[in-house]
Amino acid sequence: MKIIETVSEMQHFSESLRIAEKRLGVVPTMGALHDGHLSLVKLALKHADVAIMTIFVNPLQFGPSEDFAKYPRTFERDAMLAEKAGVSCIFAPTPETLYPSGFQTHVTVDEITQGFEGELRPGHFRGVTTVVAKLFNITKPHVAVFGEKDAQQLAAIRKMQKDLNFDVEIVPAPIVRETDGLAKSSRNIYLNPAERKQAVVLNESLEIAKSAIQHGERNVKTLLEVLNRHIQSAPLAEPDYIAIVDAESFQPVQEELLAEETYLVLLTVRFGSTRLLDNCRIEL
């Protein structure tokens, strides 16, 4: 497995693989790998001949009060896991490499990023779409795999890819869960034992909402009340937002769920200083 740190070497490596008619799949990460990330590699290798992983803790997507400095950095462990999963190359640039002195160009997706994470974390999605655009240009992939857990991020990247005509297929990867249903996340390590035990309330709430919809409930207000009530049953849980949105536009649905439409149920809940995101897709 190659480890590349410079833009020119990464571009040259990808170009040589393309000349050899290899299909390239990229898996962008911030490191601190877990089974969810490794499932992205597995999916990439179903769509491509070669898996490239990027490991970059992106300063542009962290707000001033967020955990950039303490975000876990475990590169040696990550490299070992990536190689075992079948990654052929890791691109691991420094912030100075991607954002040299004088850098001033950013990529912004407007409407999709306005609410929810975009409202609570100003500038976050501008940082995400900027770095992803750069990584597409540097790694030159045919396909790029992103997890469905970060649903608003996935929607923003899909919109960017479409609007800016990136010749990259965006492949969504299903959420990977612990045995008790908690969505795998690099931030789960911040939970203390009591918080970790109660964190299952997110997936439980989604399952309750799915069941209600399967049994005919279509009123959004009623569904949100069901979700909120179950989350509040966990004493340590503090909801940031609970919503049902159109899966493509990410616009909130206010009244009734309609037949032949696709929705996302979104949850973001705080346990102490740790924010956990989860969602489920509803196709009617």
From Swiss-Prot:
Residues that, per the record, bind (R)-pantoate: Q61, Q153
Active site: H37 (proton donor)
Family stated for the protein in its record: Belongs to the pantothenate synthetase family.
GO biological process terms on file: pantothenate biosynthetic process
Residues that bind beta-alanine: Q61
A Pfam family this chain is assigned to: Pantoate_ligase
InterPro entries: Pantoate_ligase, Pantoate_ligase_C, Rossmann-like_a/b/a_fold
Other facts: The reaction proceeds by a bi uni uni bi ping pong mechanism.
Oligomer and partners: Homodimer.
Pathway it works in: Cofactor biosynthesis; (R)-pantothenate biosynthesis; (R)-pantothenate from (R)-pantoate and beta-alanine: step 1/1
Gene: panC
GO CC terms, sorted: cytosol
Top-level division of the source organism's lineage: Bacteria
Role of this protein: Catalyzes the condensation of pantoate with beta-alanine in an ATP-dependent reaction via a pantoyl-adenylate intermediate.
Catalytic reaction annotation: (R)-pantoate + beta-alanine + ATP = (R)-pantothenate + AMP + diphosphate + H(+)
EC number from the UniProt entry: 6.3.2.1
EC top class named in words: ligase
Protein name: Pantothenate synthetase
